[in-house]
Regions:
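Acidic/His-enriched low-complexity segments
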Residues: 1-242, 366-368, 385
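Long, ordered, helix-rich scaffold segments
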Residues: 367-368, 373-374, 398, 402-407, ...
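Generic domain-boundary/flexible-linker signal
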Residues: 108, 162, 255-257, 528
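Short, glycine- and charge-enriched coil/turn segments that flank and shape catalytic ligand pockets
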Residues: 44-45, 65-68, 90-92, 169-176, ...
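Hydrophobic alpha-helical and helix-loop surface patches within well-folded domains
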Residues: 58, 80, 179, 208-463
């Protein structure tokens, strides 16, 4: 049995199979307080249960009749927090924990009215993955342990609460909201957001939540959501979570998206105005199968969540927009992977698909290895066995393991039987999973559209065409990203200015384009972008953008001191997930 080194829980003795929350959200004191009722399955005759907690105040623990139970918070362990050890009576099947969060509850980000679009009310959201749910709920915080849950959440009357379960579509005059999730999920998939929110339906099963002034833009941007859902079902079977809604969060949200069941949490940086960045939503939707339905049992197996999801996301995009479109995504993803491998070192164990994260924060494994190397492995299997056979395998895989958590080794033994792999094929798979880097002879993905982009760039750099003369009117975001990423490092400032004057990259509303431009133009000495860089880092907290930009600043002599000063100013506006990565960066310096 796989042991989760990132949880104090002992599921071989006691397993939580249902959680009931009754919580009050206090914006003035910036804390959540109330009770968690946990129903227990007593697997062995052990007389204690261990829950995961971090930065929680525990006031009292009782059984279902209100009889106090003896408890203690054990010694704190870095990253993991403290085990809450509770003594059980022989007939205890339910425990009630009375508790509150603290300033150290790093899943929570409390935003002031000034950090929201509306500017009138605060905002709260949670981010549980990987092991932060324990900072706002005492529970068994392991991806290998699944349970159903329900919740009563009490919030200020001018706000709406939404969760990763059944959701309201309008504000409640009393500020009292009830939720339930009747399918067993791991702890990291419990999420809460509270703010001045409105809802708009997009289709029979889809809708969007956002602050009122963002709602119209979000409705347009996610107009293809119902089609995406149908495409996903056509590929890999029925959607089993009833509704699929998206909430657009304030810009400090640390990720592009988070696949909370029934309600994807999304960054506003994907609102580009032209639906060009919605592959991120296809990714989170795909997680409704890979990750939420079939989950990595430990964080060492994270690639099972993400490799499958990237593969599935690109298949959705291919079915909606064609092979050329999906090929562009594959090339950009491959570029990110090569950069990550170079960063980690091509012999590093961190470039294995199966990780060894014991004694480390599992967040360390959340990079492009799991996503892009994982996807490349699945593409290799597709090539080996043919798309039709591989699609059938994936359908069977999701059905067979539905609502369970599995290890890499479970995957290997299942695929070996299902696809009747030869000894040589198994060897190839194991090399991908347990060896570093990617095979040297692996051909890089190609995109015919990007070849045309590269030709256009060559004409510009060689001086044959000015920026104004480039034939780019029909380009997608992905073509622009290829163009900007491929600009040579020794490009002249005159050329950079010509591009910027023509295409307004420095202040682009498209966050991916603006990020790529800042990463390219600032090291080249293009001073006009410096103000835009400061503004972007002061407003956006998405780690994918913020961490590389600060890393880049520290390598540019004129900005090295400024980077530290700017981080001191912006740090309080970022979520703890982003702060942790940046603190490491600046402490290493």
């Amino acid at each position: 049995m796989a042991v989760d080194m990132h949880s104090f829980a002992k599921p071989e003795d006691v397993v939580v199979n249902h959680l009931s929350l009754d919580l009050n959200v206090d914006f003035k004191l910036q804390k959540i307080s109330g009770s968690a009722i946990l129903k227990l399955n007593r697997v062995s005759n052990a007389s204690v249960v261990f829950l995961d907690t971090k930065a929680l105040k525990i006031f009292k623990v009782t059984d279902s009749k209100g009889t106090p139970l003896k408890f203690e918070l054990e010694k704190e362990v870095p990253f993991l927090g403290q085990a809450l050890k509770i003594s059980l009576q022989p007939n205890t099947r339910e425990i009630i924990v009375i508790y509150e969060t603290t300033a150290g509850s790093s899943a929570l980000q409390w935003l002031s009215p000034a950090q929201t679009l509306g500017g009138k009310h605060g905002f709260l959201f949670t981010q549980g993955q990987a092991i932060l749910s324990r900072t706002w709920i005492p529970l068994q915080d392991s991806p290998g342990i699944r349970f159903t849950w329900d919740a009563k959440i009490h919030v200020p009357t001018e706000m709406m609460a939404v969760m990763s379960g059944t959701n309201p579509t309008a504000k409640n005059a009393k500020g009292d909201y009830s939720f339930k999730m009747n399918k067993a999920v791991p702890a990291y998939l419990i999420a809460l957001a509270v703010g001045d929110l409105e809802f708009k339906e997009l289709g029979p099963r889809t809708g969007v939540y956002a602050e009122p002034s963002m709602l119209g833009k979000a409705v347009y941007e996610f107009g293809d959501l119902e089609n995406m859902l149908s495409s996903a079902e056509a590929l890999y079977g029925k959607y089993l979570w009833d509704r699929y809604d998206v909430i657009v969060l304030p810009p400090s949200f640390p990720f592009g998206g988070m696949e909370n069941p029934m309600l994807t949490f999304a960054t506003p940086t994907i609102i580009a105005g032209d639906r060009s960045l919605t592959s991120l939503v296809a990714h989170e939707l795909a997680h409704s199968w890979s990750g939420n339905l079939v989950t990595n049992k430990t964080w060492d197996d994270f690639w099972l969540n993400e490799g499958f999801t990237v593969y599935f996301e690109r298949r959705i995009m291919e079915s909606l927009y064609g092979k050329d479109y999906a090929a562009m995504l594959a090339v950009l993803g491959y570029q990110d992977l090569i950069e990550t491998i170079a960063d980690l070192g091509d012999t590093s164990e961190d470039t294995h698909l199966k990780l060894k994260l014991e004694g480390r924060d599992p967040d360390d494994g959340m990079n492009d290895i799991a996503y892009e190397k994982g996807c490349l492995l699945l593409l290799q299997i597709e090539k080996m066995k043919g798309r039709e056979a591989f699609d059938q395998f994936i359908n069977n895989y999701f059905n067979y393991f539905a609502f369970s958590s599995i290890t890499t080794e479970d995957f290997l033994s299942y695929i070996e039987k299902e696809l009747q792999l030869t000894a040589e094929e198994i060897k190839v798979l194991k090399r991908w999973i347990y060896a570093p880097g990617i095979p040297k002879d692996l051909p890089a993905p190609q995109s015919s559209l990007f070849i045309a982009v590269n030709n256009t760039l060559t004409k510009f750099v060689s001086g044959n065409l000015t920026a104004n003369e480039l034939n780019v009117q029909s380009w997608s975001t992905h073509e622009w990203l290829q163009f900007i990423r491929s600009i040579p490092d020794n490009i002249s400032l005159t050329n950079l200015k010509d591009l910027d004057d023509t295409f307004k990259f420095t202040n682009s509303e498209n966050s991916e384009i603006r990020f790529a431009w800042l990463m390219k133009s600032i090291p080249a000495g293009y001073l006009n972008a410096d103000i835009s860089l400061d503004e972007f880092l002061s407003r956006v907290g998405r780690r994918k953008f913020v961490l590389p930009l600060f890393k880049m600043m520290l390598k540019v002599p004129r900005l090295e001191t400024h980077a530290s000063e700017l981080y001191t100013k912006t740090r309080d506006g970022y979520h703890a997930v982003t702060v942790q990565s940046l603190d490491e960066l600046f402490n290493k310096k």
